[in-house]
Amino acid sequence: MALTDSLTGVFNRRYVSAHLPRLMERSWESQKPVAILMFDIDHFKTVNDTYGHGVGDEVLREVANRTNRNLRNFDLVARYGGEEFIVVMPDTDRDAAYAVAERLRRRVGEETFAVSTQAAEITVTISIGVAVVDGVGDTADAILKRADDALYQAKRSGRNRTVASGVAEAPVG
């Protein structure tokens, strides 16, 4: 059974489902937080509709690469489905996770993506939800739901934003 996404080379949803509960248990035992970043590419359907699915695939691969380049080597990156990704960050509190999410959001949006099949470059942005395991008894489903809820708050607030679960939204910048 594959644990990596064949398109992007990062872990897949199955891997996260299998390993997140273990990481959470270690977090409780060590009393160190685990942060979850859940993000997706804003208006990704437009990329596919305008440039084709091949270009969409290139964008997904490059977003995965940029994500990996902006994280520590022990953070876990996974494609959760479609254009949605998850980052699991052990030993990371809410403030540190928010700072990493903002850096990632800015870096993805600042660099253009070269379109190999056309003489064009495109820019994409991402919206990010942040949640932190905040106590013994939290479940993987609960932390993922908090991250997902924060992600959708970021999207409802105009996209290209980071929102932390349980924290008032900070201005983009």
Where are these regions (language model features)?
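Signal-transducing coiled-coil linker helices
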Residues: 1-7, 14-26, 33, 75-76, ...
